[in-house]
Amino acid sequence: MTEATSELVIWRNGRLATLNPDHAQPYGLLERHALLVRDGRIAAIVAEDDVPSGRSIDLEGRLVTPGLIDCHTHLVFGGSRAQEWEQRLNGVSYQTISASGGGINSTVRATRDSSEAELLALAQPRLERLLREGVTTLEIKSGYGLDLPNERKMLRVARQLADHNGVELSATLLSAHATPPEYQGDADGYITLVCETILPTLWQEGLFESVDVFCENVGFSPQQTERVFQAAQALGIPVKGHVEQLSSLGGAQLVSRYHGLSADHIEYLTEEGVAAMRESGTVAALLPGAFYFLNETRKPPVELLRKYQVPMAVATDFNPGTSPFASLHLAMNMACVKFGLTPEEAWAGVTRHAARALGRQASHGQLAPGFVANFAIWDAEHPVEMVYEPGRSPLWHRVVQGELQ
């Protein structure tokens, strides 16, 4: 990204969907308003009649929203799982596929066998699909390397992707994603490697800003998850968790006990878990793509989340095994159709609540004075259009840190 200019730039004659909950109108809509941007941040929002003199860009009545935030992705990986999906449709069990070398282990193998340049080339078109939908910030997880050099490689590629494409990155260490082949039968030993070697080394190298764990019967136990959280906490690193996707293990309560940023998936979330998340300020990250692709039937408890006023983020969970959808608009649509969110809730889920899921709620996810000038400009009349019709992105331009992309 180019360096933000200190000159005041006036983005005038826009229809602003601020997503600011303090504004009375749905979506925080402000008709005929202008954004005043300086040093990569929003200096002020003023009515069109009050625009000062200075360098201006005429939006010609276009819709402006906060830049979209995809707060949960596995964008960097090698290989493909398309044939495995076809096998599953033909009745072959995941256990059979895994025993023959498929499943997550096939992605681990392909990722380990790929160079940084190869992983970058594979991830680039995936990222471009998200950028075409107005994404200005995204999270990318490791988790297909499962050893020090390959986890490092994945995180380095994530950083290069962001640097080359005008997008802000939140990198997450997900080394506790699965037990690698060389540690089969010794998950505790692998967690020791994560806690004592991978996590502190890559943290010292500045390659990530949060730590995630897959806490499930087919992943890691709550006890193993807590070991990773303790190692992260000792270094002052925020945590989050893949929890309650396939069963109820108390993962949401565990994430909440460590004041985690988000609890993700949460189809089997209990009321006790929801209450714990409310108390800790943990965001509920809904991932409808995985729910759809796995043909699940148990839905996240959206009504309970509303009752307890737990913020709901929405993300793609883009990954090769369970959610091969690089479309945040589609995730928003699925969240409405499958989980019962309103379009306005879905928009909050990819803006201000997604920002909170990344610990950036004070600077991202709204059009508001003092916030980073990340926004999307649309040839659209209303924000609902992007939720209603996924696959047709009316994006005009993205603006990242005040710079037109």
Curated annotation (Swiss-Prot):
Binds 1 zinc or iron ion per subunit. Pathway: Amino-acid degradation; L-histidine degradation into L-glutamate; N-formimidoyl-L-glutamate from L-histidine: step 3/3. The keyword Transmembrane does not apply. It is an enzyme of class 3 (hydrolase). One of its GO terms (cellular component) is cytoplasm. Its cofactor is Zn(2+); Fe(3+). It catalyses: 4-imidazolone-5-propanoate + H2O = N-formimidoyl-L-glutamate. N-formimidoyl-L-glutamate binds at residues 144, 319, 321. Its main location: cytoplasm. It comes from the Bacteria. The keyword Zinc applies. Gene3D superfamilies: Metal-dependent hydrolases (3.20.20.140), Urease, subunit C, domain 1 (2.30.40.10). One of its GO terms (biological process) is L-histidine catabolic process to glutamate and formate. Fe(3+) binds at residues 72, 74, 242, 317. Catalyzes the hydrolytic cleavage of the carbon-nitrogen bond in imidazolone-5-propanoate to yield N-formimidoyl-L-glutamate. It is the third step in the universal histidine degradation pathway. Belongs to the metallo-dependent hydrolases superfamily. HutI family. This is Imidazolonepropionase. The lineage of its organism: Bacteria, Pseudomonadati, Pseudomonadota, Gammaproteobacteria, Enterobacterales.
